[in-house]
Amino acid sequence: MSYKISRAAYANMFGPTTGDKVRLADTELFIEVEKDFTTYGEEVKFGGGKVIRDGMGQSQVTRANGAVDTVITNALIVDTWGIVKADVGLKNGRIAAIGKAGNPDTQPGITIIIGPSTEIIAGEGKILTAGGMDAHIHFICPQQIEEALMSGVTTMLGGGSGPAHGTLATTCTGAWHIERMIESFDAFPMNLALAGKGNASLPAALEEMVLAGACSLKLHEDWGTTPAAIDCCLSVADEYDVQVMIHTDTLNESGFVEDTIGAIKGRTIHAFHTEGAGGGHAPDIIKICGQSNVIPSSTNPTRPYTVNTIAEHLDMLMVCHHLSPSIPEDIAFAESRIRKETIAAEDILHDIGAFSIISSDSQAMGRVGEVAIRTWQTADKMKRQRGRLAQETGDNDNFRVKRYIAKYTINPAIAQGLSHEVGSIEVGKRADLVIWNPAFFGVKPEMVLLGGSIAAAPMGDPNASIPTPQPMHYRPMFAAYGKSLTNSSVTFVSQASLDAGLAGRLGVAKKLLAVKNTRGGISKASMIHNSLTPHIEVDPETYEVRADGELLTCEPATVLPMAQRYFLF
């Protein structure tokens, strides 16, 4: 006998279902549930008097015979492939199934078996996303890693060796330092990966860094991003299947943007802070986002364009690049990089899917814990200023949300050769997952999982009688300790370094995994929902930006969501 229940009552008990809408934090972004995998009346939920009990929603099936390790029940998945409600089963640290959980002996349509060994995470009324990936990290201090984890980032790729002046400005790690850094990674609950320096005109030193464990190479103007260095670096990358990230020549000393495009020779490359405030050919590096072989990304200090963006950038730049305010040439260098016209255009290029990735540039002009926040602030600003996207098919913002979440999950993973392991909620991938209360979406996660184990969560007083009394703050959980730490996260390296015996030589506890498919197999077209290649023109005097002839301009925001309302200090 069926029982009717109101939508409001159903959502309160089991979370939103097909056709229901959810607001993301305090933004103007609204998502609509596209599909619900449940069977109405057969939902599973944990708790006193609830369904997941012996002989009811819990079966007698052992783990060995198919029961999963963990089920996240009734979660609203937000990913590039869909916005759907489902149970998610985790096993052996990976996503085992997305569908309907329960007891196949008593319930129909079960695709995820709950057994006595199964742990439950209540996803009712929560949003589930893939862990974020930050592909532009300056490893200036190890404390960044905890900050990033608590913001919902589960994979960090970058370079450096601490607060050395080379690392303060660039993400280029030398061969000996790569090995020392990989050894240190056993201490951190985070998937980690290193870039070697790409600035050399002969290949031997670059090959040395790849064999030491670099999974990518970084060309940075502070080390001399000349056409010869660009060509040499890309040639080594093609041979070893590692990605190249580029920060081009702001001063145009060794050539202009056209010369850099010529030196790249149509090969795949990941262009950092492609707008230019973070560095690159002044004033028109932004042109390269129209190249089919260039994967363009932003760093978060220019995300989004606000009334404060220009003012804060000059001082940041002077500190990060070891410049002196008493030297006129240094000031001129800094000022040449900061242009309100190109920053405004960057907002729009993200919204139309011409810029593909957002990362932090941690402590080197960027904020490591604000990748998600700045991404969604940009999306909100663009909706308010530009309205609905043409691709939207319903009374919702589903397409825009899919476009923007791709920028810090699957797209950086594809660009850097990690997407076979991380970047999306798909069966077979690592269970690096983030659970959000919709009111705090993108700002403060409710739980962060690494390899299927809980690594971080807000937690109250450990001496309290329940978990919620103040002081409530983020704390590392069990996956952040002991052997669970090294079994729950991994280090990404080059295949060549594994073939050369890196794991045995270093003796690290974390598993070393190889990146793959970073070269000719990918391009701008591989960037999900963010593959547009418009023809870009920049006026050399006014810095106005046009895409396919259309002027790209917008006003700076005076107020942002996901800001002071969420942060007391």
UniProtKB/Swiss-Prot annotation:
<dbReference type="InterPro" id="IPR029754">
    <property type="entry name" value="Urease_Ni-bd"/>
</dbReference>
<keyword id="KW-0479">Metal-binding</keyword>
<dbReference type="InterPro" id="IPR011059">
    <property type="entry name" value="Metal-dep_hydrolase_composite"/>
</dbReference>
<feature type="binding site" description="via carbamate group">
    <location>
        <position position="218"/>
    </location>
    <ligand>
        <name>Ni(2+) 2</name>
    </ligand>
</feature>
<dbReference type="InterPro" id="IPR017951">
    <property type="entry name" value="Urease_asu_c"/>
</dbReference>
<feature type="binding site">
    <location>
        <position position="361"/>
    </location>
    <ligand>
        <name>Ni(2+) 1</name>
    </ligand>
</feature>
<comment type="pathway">
    <text>Nitrogen metabolism; urea degradation; CO(2) and NH(3) from urea (urease route): step 1/1.</text>
</comment>
<protein>
    <recommendedName>
        <fullName>Urease subunit alpha</fullName>
        <ecNumber>3.5.1.5</ecNumber>
    </recommendedName>
</protein>
<comment type="similarity">
    <text>Belongs to the metallo-dependent hydrolases superfamily. Urease alpha subunit family.</text>
</comment>
<dbReference type="InterPro" id="IPR005848">
    <property type="entry name" value="Urease_asu"/>
</dbReference>
<dbReference type="InterPro" id="IPR032466">
    <property type="entry name" value="Metal_Hydrolase"/>
</dbReference>
<feature type="modified residue" description="N6-carboxylysine">
    <location>
        <position position="218"/>
    </location>
</feature>
<feature type="domain" description="Urease">
    <location>
        <begin position="131"/>
        <end position="569"/>
    </location>
</feature>
<dbReference type="Pfam" id="PF01979">
    <property type="entry name" value="Amidohydro_1"/>
</dbReference>
<dbReference type="InterPro" id="IPR006680">
    <property type="entry name" value="Amidohydro-rel"/>
</dbReference>
<feature type="binding site">
    <location>
        <position position="220"/>
    </location>
    <ligand>
        <name>substrate</name>
    </ligand>
</feature>
<feature type="binding site">
    <location>
        <position position="136"/>
    </location>
    <ligand>
        <name>Ni(2+) 1</name>
    </ligand>
</feature>
<dbReference type="GO" id="GO:0009039">
    <property type="term" value="F:urease activity"/>
</dbReference>
<dbReference type="InterPro" id="IPR050112">
    <property type="entry name" value="Urease_alpha_subunit"/>
</dbReference>
<dbReference type="GO" id="GO:0016151">
    <property type="term" value="F:nickel cation binding"/>
</dbReference>
<keyword id="KW-0378">Hydrolase</keyword>
<dbReference type="InterPro" id="IPR011612">
    <property type="entry name" value="Urease_alpha_N_dom"/>
</dbReference>
<feature type="active site" description="Proton donor">
    <location>
        <position position="321"/>
    </location>
</feature>
<feature type="binding site" description="via carbamate group">
    <location>
        <position position="218"/>
    </location>
    <ligand>
        <name>Ni(2+) 1</name>
    </ligand>
</feature>
<dbReference type="GO" id="GO:0005737">
    <property type="term" value="C:cytoplasm"/>
</dbReference>
<feature type="binding site">
    <location>
        <position position="273"/>
    </location>
    <ligand>
        <name>Ni(2+) 2</name>
    </ligand>
</feature>
<feature type="binding site">
    <location>
        <position position="138"/>
    </location>
    <ligand>
        <name>Ni(2+) 1</name>
    </ligand>
</feature>
<dbReference type="Pfam" id="PF00449">
    <property type="entry name" value="Urease_alpha"/>
</dbReference>
<feature type="binding site">
    <location>
        <position position="247"/>
    </location>
    <ligand>
        <name>Ni(2+) 2</name>
    </ligand>
</feature>
<dbReference type="GO" id="GO:0043419">
    <property type="term" value="P:urea catabolic process"/>
</dbReference>
<dbReference type="InterPro" id="IPR017950">
    <property type="entry name" value="Urease_AS"/>
</dbReference>
<keyword id="KW-0963">Cytoplasm</keyword>
<keyword id="KW-0533">Nickel</keyword>
<comment type="subunit">
    <text>Heterotrimer of UreA (gamma), UreB (beta) and UreC (alpha) subunits. Three heterotrimers associate to form the active enzyme.</text>
</comment>
